[in-house]
Amino acid sequence: AVSLVLPQLK
């Protein structure tokens, strides 16, 4: 789940 959010912020 977290892996999906971090790339979106980048």
UniProtKB/Swiss-Prot annotation:
Keyword Chloroplast appears in the UniProt entry: no
Enzyme class: oxidoreductase
E.C. number: 1.2.1.13
Keyword Oxidoreductase annotated: yes
Reaction(s) this enzyme catalyzes, per UniProt: D-glyceraldehyde 3-phosphate + phosphate + NADP(+) = (2R)-3-phospho-glyceroyl phosphate + NADPH + H(+)
Gene Ontology molecular function: any one: glyceraldehyde-3-phosphate dehydrogenase (NADP+) (phosphorylating) activity
Record keywords, A-Z: NADP, Oxidoreductase
Homology family: Belongs to the glyceraldehyde-3-phosphate dehydrogenase family.
Record's subunit section: Tetramer of either four A chains (GAPDH 2) or two A and two B chains (GAPDH 1).
Listed name of the protein: Glyceraldehyde-3-phosphate dehydrogenase B
Biological classification of the source: Eukaryota, Viridiplantae, Streptophyta, Embryophyta, Tracheophyta
